[in-house]
Amino acid sequence: MKIINIGVLAHVDAGKTTLTESLLYNSGAITELGSVDRGTTKTDNTLLERQRGITIQTAITSFQWKNTKVNIIDTPGHMDFLAEVYRSLSVLDGAILLISAKDGVQAQTRILFHALRKIGIPTIFFINKIDQNGIDLSTVYQDIKEKLSAEIVIKQKVELHPNMRVMNFTESEQWDMVIEGNDYLLEKYTSGKLLEALELEQEESIRFHNCSLFPVYHGSAKNNIGIDNLIEVITNKFYSSTHRGQSELCGKVFKIEYSEKRQRLAYIRLYSGVLHLRDPVRISEKEKIKITEMYTSINGELCKIDKAYSGEIVILQNEFLKLNSVLGDTKLLPQRERIENPLPLLQTTVEPSKPQQREMLLDALLEISDSDPLLRYYVDSATHEIILSFLGKVQMEVTCALLQEKYHVEIEIKEPTVIYMERPLKKAEYTIHIEVPPNPFWASIGLSVAPLPLGSGVQYESSVSLGYLNQSFQNAVMEGIRYGCEQGLYGWNVTDCKICFKYGLYYSPVSTPADFRMLAPIVLEQVLKKAGTELLEPYLSFKIYAPQEYLSRAYNDAPKYCANIVDTQLKNNEVILSGEIPARCIQEYRSDLTFFTNGRSVCLTELKGYHVTTGEPVCQPRRPNSRIDKVRYMFNKIT
């Protein structure tokens, strides 16, 4: 059986959850249509999603049609950072991008389409809600061509009120765009030679799967118009991005979820091989897990299974698998699955409104952060404050809503601040010797640091021979340095430098790896004091799309938000501004754009990198460590 995984994507209120229900109903997977208004849909399965009528977490269901199983991944529709979009789309074989016939292409539609093209996912446009009054499809087509892609092929005729029906075009009516995009076919056509239907279909299929041609279909999910035809299109046009005939197992965890009974569930997309119940499965070079229970979605219901094939999505109840864990051979992952999640850019302090709910809050954050790698938290051991790190405002708003509506915890939140990094200013060396006060550890360590270009990260090397200092001591030094890099002179992560372990001494009767592990961060702090550090702040690259009449305002406002516009383009009465902006300023700039363009602007952002800051350094309190802080204090007193 053929297995394909598709995503249903759209801007808010375009009807994507309703379309999913219609696909399930028309294929026979369910016997009664669910309703977003009544909160009875299959895919918006949390109370928060049903109450708000939006999709917050990736939901999965399926149907079977003829010899094809279709897993539908109803992906989130509220995303404020492209990395979040990429993560949720990476498991798809294809996508249906909904466009409301009444509203046309919206800002969210453009963000989603941008991500689909970048990742390389074949996409069908489905114009929904054609049964509403006042529809002008020619305007919608023009909107798609101007804001998404001109490379579309209209596959159907539509009769609006009062007949309300959708019919496939005849062969000759739908091939113009296919012919125009191929020089060989165009020359053959203009010379009067007969074009075979097979070669036209093959050309359309090639361009569709290369993401250079986008078929357009029509219907009404609510009133079940055009859905049967869409099911045929889905099962015929899409194919699975799996390794056919490859026996080696490869799968990736793309979602972690907690059931109502607090069971931890890992969702896995299989890319090759067969997964059997009770199989020992490698998840790293040294680690294996045993499959004791396995589920998949069959006709909209979760069912236990004994084995799963390449292309399938399986669900395991497991405490050890993490988001992005790979089962089996990593080399068999598709290239788009190798996109790394960025670090959070913002942080804030959260506390429960009712102090007695503190443990409930911590338990809830543990589950939420486990499900979302772009959300992190820790408890400051000195102040006992709960520090939450995240990427963007919408993510924070959804987290607050989840805490209140799913976990019944109300919180108080402070204004978010940017997460900075630190880089050494110059080369420096420092050594702390054994038995020289105030060193209480049975170890000598000498380190050097040197700045590297922005974006290099931390590079570590040891020039101390393994013949002299064995691997366990060397590992301890590296672990201590890794810990020390978490807090530089101003309390931020240290990056973009080369750290060299240049000197080590131990006393064989008494020295232990713990001595080296404890001493290393103290030596690192002293060598950083000698080198000095500078603060780096995150910068985003942005691309703004806005009506041409707002060019002057958008351009002139940029310096107010420290934005640097590097390119300006005019296209189809629309201005496209590209540039860079500090992460701390993007939310205000984006809000301002939305306000003065009346919601007609789109702002796409991605992490560009880190730039050196100017002005007074921003400090954050150091996290205490009872085992080394007294020694740190004594060394800081004498240096």
Swiss-Prot record:
Residues 1-242 form the tr-type G domain. Keywords: Antibiotic resistance, GTP-binding, Nucleotide-binding, Protein biosynthesis, Transposable element. Transmembrane segments: none annotated. It comes from the Bacteria. The keyword Hydrolase does not apply. Gene3D superfamilies: 3.30.230.10, 3.30.70.240, Elongation Factor G (Translational Gtpase), domain 3 (3.30.70.870), P-loop containing nucleotide triphosphate hydrolases (3.40.50.300), Translation factors (2.40.30.10). One of its GO terms (molecular function) is GTPase activity. GTP binds at residues 10-17, 74-78, 128-131. GO terms for biological process: response to antibiotic; ribosome disassembly; translation. Abolishes the inhibitory effect of tetracyclin on protein synthesis by a non-covalent modification of the ribosomes. Belongs to the TRAFAC class translation factor GTPase superfamily. Classic translation factor GTPase family. TetM/TetO subfamily. This is Tetracycline resistance protein TetM from transposon Tn1545.
